[in-house]
Amino acid sequence: MSLKWCDSLGDSLMPSLCVRQENREAKIARVNMKAVASPQAQKTPTIAKIPVRWARTGIFVAYTAAGCWIALGLESIIRPEQENYRDWLWLAPFLLTMLTFYFVHMVQSGVGQNMERAGFYFVMVASVLALTGNLGVSLEQRTLATLGFPWGAVLWTVGLMGFGLGTWQAKVLPRYVALTLILLEPLSILTGVLLAPVSPLHPRGGYSAGVEKGLCLALIGMGLRAIMTRDKDDA
């Protein structure tokens, strides 16, 4: 018996039965509302859609990048003189960092945040400029070197801020990952300045700030690991 039938005919023939039917349907509606409001039903769709293979591989790449950055940074601090061969060693952690950003983007790509997507592509373009500029420095090609600094460095900083804000909005990764992306380059500059008394700043061949970048990449790896653990707990 439907409420429509009660409204049209039932009220005149069987009013008590119609009242019971209304109460029954109201109870069903309340039960459905409770089910939707329960924590189990409110699992965010982003968690369910996380591609596990991207997160798992991203953890490994992020930790590897962190180790490379820290090793490069410590070597620059222990041996503070300018060593141009470090410009070539820099390629390894930087490429791994680009790859880490790719995996960070992939695990939250299902959310469809325009800022996150735009920030990621912006960072990738800036990274290519930085790579080209670093090769220009190593090969002593000034035209190529200007692509890395100032253009590549400035765009990379701005892109990371946008990427971090988009990651914050996506709500897939922990908040500290978004903050790490936003502050990665400003803290890198600050680290280099603070370490200048023990590891002087050089035009090239000095990467003492690699220690900061390594710690940031380790935090990103921890964030990727956290969403995998959270996904297992919710399963």
Residue ranges of each PLM-predicted region?
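Hydrophobic, aromatic-enriched alpha-helical segments typical of multi-pass transmembrane helices
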Residues: K34-D234
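General structural signal for secondary-structure boundaries
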Residues: L13, E22, M228-R230
